[in-house]
Amino acid sequence: MAMIRSAGLHGFRALVAELGGDAGDIAVRSGLPTAALESNQMLVSDAAVAVALETAAHELSCPDFGLRMARRQDLNLLGPLGLAVKHSESLATALRYVSDFLFVHAEGLRIWAVPDPLGSPDVAGVEFDAGPGRVPTPQSTALVLGFAHRAAVELVGGPYGLRSVELPHDPPDPEAYAAYFQGPVRGGRASAVIRITGSLASLLLREHDEELQRLAGAMLARHRRNPADDVVQQVRTALSHAMGQAPLTLGAVARQMSVHPRTLQRLLASAGTSFAEVLDDLRRHNARQLLVGTDLPIAQVAQRVGYAEAATFTRRAHAWWGTTPMRVRHGAQLS
């Protein structure tokens, strides 16, 4: 179970009350202590937070609940991380701080820069992932992406070149989402990504302060990520580089990382996962991205994610999505 600081619930009680609900009741039924609604520093289950957001959205008939929560939160909730982000030189530097130190506030969440999932060379992507083997819920995704969007506008001092927002699910309220992001919002995608025109490094921040950035960075450097979590990311990176080009085996990755295979197995187990789970999660992610974002033949998609035969890939697709790769692609095109 991944933990998250209760700052992620900031504004929950007030918003639920405005909508005519009982925040304490929803919290308890979702597995959260009511004290978490009054503090920004408690560690609570991220799964329970996700349940609370979905419950509130459903019971209060508020499909854009996550976006409304995002409007009530700002970078000050992130402490030293917020300071480092705010006083960075560019959006690229700010995003690196988030990628490296978001674990201080949310163990499982990952946000990082990626190439454009639709393949445009002049577009950058900022991707949100709930972690290996975890599927982000619509309201949690809205809260994270909504927060990131508002922060980017504040940091840059205006529009930052948002091209589109890609979601792994249909937007619960298309009009509200389009109005919030001031751009196209599309569902049925491989992952949650904000697409941005141009280079993130070229987007300079209006409150850049080298000394404050250095001091905030020094405070963040005192925090140490769980070594096992680092191993998961290292394995994922090694597999990404080898996928479709080299054997995707525990032994091959262990050799690349200069550790014994059994040691690597133990480290992954201590992170609550396994080599097979990390590989399967990466294959699923990459396969959906290729199906949705390209027109590569199915056999070539299979090869790109490490399957020698399209039939094997198709069987695995049924396990992931309950349907065939072609139907995944067709469904995305219709969305």
For the regions a language model picked out, list residue spans one by one:
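Short acidic/histidine-centered micro-motifs embedded in hydrophobic/aromatic stretches
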Residues: 29-33, 168, 281
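N-terminal regulatory/effector-sensing and dimerization cores
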Residues: 76-200
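Conserved active-site and cofactor/substrate-binding residues in soluble primary-metabolism enzymes
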Residues: 7, 21, 143, 230, ...
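Short amphipathic alpha-helical face segments that pack within enzyme cores
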Residues: 11, 143-147, 286
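Hydrophobic alpha-helical core bundles mediating ligand binding, dimerization, or RNAP-core interactions
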Residues: 53, 145-148, 220, 239
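N-terminal low-complexity or simple alpha-helical regulatory segments
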Residues: 1-123
